[in-house]
């Protein structure tokens, strides 16, 4: 894997770790997430970074073995362009249900 792709994978991994850090001292509850604007904005920003990094990866490695690669880019685009209709429950679901698996996939690629 080329150096630039590894850098983008590391950017995604760093964003995941940052989101985990945001949540480590807070209850992992949807209500807490909804009531904390700073937390939501921090998560949104990291999702934007992950989506942009994935978009750059897909341009050079279109068959990267990441299950939801295209959805990550689509989510980034939605967060940026449809910010006024972004539903907190969808964002929360991504954090709780999708990030742990994505983290595993990225770790495998970074170790390989």
Regions from the PLM with identified roles:
Residues 1-112:
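Solvent-exposed interaction patches of small proteins and small membrane subunits
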